[in-house]
Every structure is written in structure tokens, then in C-alpha cells.
A protein has these predicted regions:
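Non-heme Fe(II)/2-oxoglutarate
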Residues: 1-85, 101
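Catalytic core of non-heme Fe(II) oxygenases with the double-stranded beta-helix
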Residues: 66, 70-189
Length: 189
């Protein structure tokens, strides 16, 4: 039987992308008419609900970036999670303006999200360019604090199981940019 001996749920790596790569991705979003993000899952059609999720997004298909993401997903999965993962889902660049947020949720569920195994979020913004916008997880951190908060360093990546409850707290000043994608495989159940 395969076990997760370290019981890690959130993996963080600094300098996944350079500052110039982050800026290039932020500019890509601004040049490509972002759309309002929808809620996905157990619905007949995806829906928009700004009370739950308020941000914009644009998809990006960059082979070099996709390969780099896949390689890190596979390394983290081999070392820690040990899931059956097979393919990278669409990569999206997200923009959260003042008031932007995403309340507590998971990234896996029914229908098209049922095959999501791992989530990756890359911090594109400089952490001093916005206030609020913390990526929080519904797990206790090493200090005993109830919600673990991910690091906000530009270019860093955070990988975690898609079933792990998380949120982005409301932006109170500035703009937060991030990149998100998922590694998919056969559903857990």
C-alpha cells in the first residue's frame, strides 16, 4: 500500500517563474480580453455568482510553460501525493481587483471537475502591489493557526490536492494576478 508518510497537503516552491515571466503573463491577460470567472461543478451550466467568486480569467496555451508545470506536478506527486495523474488541464491567468475574492471551495467535485487531482497556483503579482487576496487553506498550520496561508512571493508556486478546501480572501487594495491549473486523472471514487 502506498502511503503519504510526511502528511503534507500543501507544497510550496519559490522562483518557479522569474519576475519577467510573471510580468509577461500579466500583460497577456490584459491584452486578451479576460472574461468573468464562473463556478464549475454540479450544475447543468456553469454559473457566475460574484458573491462567491469575483475575478476575471483568460486561458493561455504555452507549450514551454505547460511542460514546466507538468514536470513539477509529476515531481510533487511522485514525492508526496502518489495519485494517478495523467494530463494537464487548461492553464488560466486570473485577475482579482478590489473586492475580488473566491470564498471557501474545493477544485474537485462533479462532472468536469471530478478528474482533478492536484491544483497549482502561481503567484504572478508582487506581494506589495495588493492587500488582502491571501490564499488560505482549511488546515492548521505549524503554529496552530486554523487557516494555513500560502506564501505570496512573486513567481512562487503552491501545489495541493484539488479536494482541499481553500479560498482567496477579498482584495482591499491593488490587483492580484495568479496562474492556475490542475493535473487530472481518474476520479478518486
Amino acid at each position: 500500500m502506498i502511503t503519504n508518510d510526511t502528511f503534507e497537503f500543501v507544497v510550496h516552491k519559490e522562483n518557479f517563474l522569474s519576475e519577467s515571466q510573471c510580468v509577461k503573463l500579466m500583460r497577456y491577460l490584459e491584452r486578451n480580453e479576460p472574461t468573468i470567472s464562473e463556478l464549475a461543478g454540479n450544475y447543468d451550466n456553469n454559473i457566475m455568482n460574484k458573491e462567491v467568486r469575483d475575478n476575471q480569467e483568460v486561458k493561455i496555451n504555452d507549450e514551454k510553460l505547460n511542460n514546466k508545470l507538468k514536470m513539477l506536478f509529476e515531481l510533487a506527486n511522485h514525492s508526496i501525493f502518489k495519485y494517478n495523474i495523467q494530463e494537464l488541464e487548461s492553464v488560466k491567468i486570473l485577475k482579482y481587483g478590489v473586492g475580488g475574492k473566491y470564498k471557501w471551495h474545493t477544485d474537485s467535485g462533479a462532472k468536469e471537475t471530478s478528474t482533478r487531482k492536484l491544483t497549482a497556483i502561481v503567484q504572478l503579482s508582487d506581494e506589495t502591489n495588493y492587500e488582502g487576496g491571501d490564499l488560505e487553506f482549511g488546515i492548521t498550520d505549524e503554529t496552530g493557526k486554523n487557516n494555513y496561508t500560502a506564501k505570496r512571493t512573486r513567481g512562487s508556486i503552491t501545489i495541493f490536492p484539488a479536494f482541499l478546501s481553500h479560498r482567496v480572501t477579498p482584495i482591499t487594495q491593488g490587483t492580484r494576478y495568479s496562474l492556475i491549473t490542475w493535473m487530472n486523472g481518474d476520479c478518486f471514487v
